[in-house]
Amino acid sequence: MINTSIPLVDLHRHLDGNVRVNTIWELGHQHGIALPADSLETLAPFVQIQGKETSLVAFLKKLDWMVAVLADLDAVKRVAYENVADAALSGLDYAELRFSPYYMAMNHKLPIEGVVEAVIDGVKAGLKDYQVKINLIGIMSRSFGQAACAQELEGLLAHKQHLVAMDLAGDELGFPGELFNEHFKRVRDAGLAITAHAGEAAGSQSMWQAIQELGATRIGHGVNAIHDPKLMDYLAKHRIGIESCPTSNLHTSTVSSYAEHPFRTFMDAGVLISLNTDDPGVSAIDIKHEYRIAKSELGLSYAELAQVQRNGVEMAFLSESERKALYAAKA
């Protein structure tokens, strides 16, 4: 399923959506946080998707448990370290880990900049122990409003040298992208790349706004682009990458089934598209699972899967020399 001569990457992967079940259990007990279960085994269904359940509300509840146990900065550092370990152990050559410091800080009123520093420190520690290339993407969580995002941005830009890009995530319908135009002007001025969750809950106009006003060169999910032929042409012509997460889209009810997923439509239209895990801790998947699904459920051939792998490397927020180094390591 995976072509071993091509680097394997995961570009849309939430660090705060990938907390191990045993880590939630241990941190909960360490900090006296009431958990919804009385054993490690019975905790799993509260924090991971089991079977075929597909509901955005259920998904977000599980996600919330992942940050509920971040009681101090050491917990944040541990989770960041384990994210590097998990990326390496799942066979990835390169991953971009994105995180929302406000979301991670809010339950226990941690300092936002302190959370950013703890993530950076945890990743650095992980890279000493594991063979994988990692870059970080900062998230502004739009659901908490403009002021919270401004705070979040301050904490992230204070450490911009450790980031490759900024993302906008959260409630796309309640907090449209135009509320954050000024925030992203600061991101562009700081020299960071931009990706945005768009066209997931809202229509194609949300994607146009992210590209034309925020400055996004990649779009997270973007499933609703397929209803706008002009946008599809634009995406293909300008090599705007779609960070696709099929299993997550199913789990959040963004699509009703794998058969309904537009991945194939994007490929046939010549749009640059990659496979990603989104919140692997919640979905209980790894990148290889997404490639298996792409073959068995989305109907991609081995040649098309190889192209998707190459697309991921092309879409990555890397320099040309870094891209070449990834390929050279596979030779």
From Swiss-Prot:
Organism of this sequence: Shewanella sp. (strain MR-7)
Protein name: Adenosine deaminase
Cofactor(s) demanded: Zn(2+)
Annotated active site: 200
GO process terms (BP): adenosine catabolic process; hypoxanthine salvage; inosine biosynthetic process; nucleotide metabolic process; purine ribonucleoside monophosphate biosynthetic process
Any one annotated GO CC term: cytosol
Cofactor note: Binds 1 zinc ion per subunit.
Similarity comment: family membership: Belongs to the metallo-dependent hydrolases superfamily. Adenosine and AMP deaminases family. Adenosine deaminase subfamily.
